[in-house]
Structures are given as C-alpha cells and as structure tokens.
C-alpha cells in the first residue's frame, strides 16, 4: 500500500514530463495506491488555477483516474466532482453539498447560493 501525493496525480493527468509522467502511471498500476481526501482538492485547484483546465475537464480527468486508486469515500468524491463540473461552486463547497445530499449531513454556511443549492437539489439515494 502506498499513499500518493498530488504530484503523482498531476503527472498522470497532465502527461507533461517524459520521465516522471510514465513513472507516476507505473506507480499507480503496480501498487495499491491510496489518495487522501485532502489530495483531490489540491489537484482540482492546481489543474484550474495553474494549468487553466475548465471544470468539466478537471472532473473528467480525475474521474478517469479513480479506478486506479483507493479513495476513502469514492462515492462522495464522484458526486462532488460531478457537482463541480455542473455547478458554479468551489470544489470544497461541492464536497459539502455532496455530504448533505448523500448522507443528510447538515451544513452551516453564510453562502446564500450554497444554502439555496442545499435546499433545492434532491438527495441522492445510497442504494
């Protein structure tokens, strides 16, 4: 078992380094690799702010990567990425929204737009 950092995720998605990108992909293919919940928001941020990826491309790239790694709550991650690609919220707000819709967790916020999304988006079935 290996925990992978954001650099591994980025090298696999970006394929921007002749030496490191294939190495990163090989690490994912030949090991049971875990991604901590904190790594995905960092990858989302870097892909958007540093590399200029749009929301849909970010969500698609990370969703394509998920079968290669173990994520603690993959269902939550998938839903948050889907919200991120479809709604105009920061990724962390999408995680909060996904927690509310999947598990009924209450969210305290001063963000009226997020509050409205919590009130109007339907819950997601766990089954």
Language-model regions: role of each:
Residues 8-9, 39, 76, 95-96, ...:
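Alpha-helix capping/helix-boundary segments
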Residues 11-13, 46, 117-118:
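Residues that scaffold the ATP/ADP-binding catalytic core of kinase and kinase-like folds
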Residues 24-31, 62-66, 100-101, 118:
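Alpha-helix C-terminal capping segments
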Residues 70-110:
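Active-site neighborhoods of divalent-metal-dependent phosphate/nucleic-acid chemistry enzymes
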Residues 46-68, 75:
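Active-site-proximal, substrate-binding regions of enzyme catalytic domains
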Residues 1-35, 50-57, 127:
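Short, well-structured N-terminal submotif of metal-dependent ribonuclease cores
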Residues 1, 97, 101-127:
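Acidic, PIN/NYN-like endoribonuclease modules and their adjacent C-terminal/linker elements
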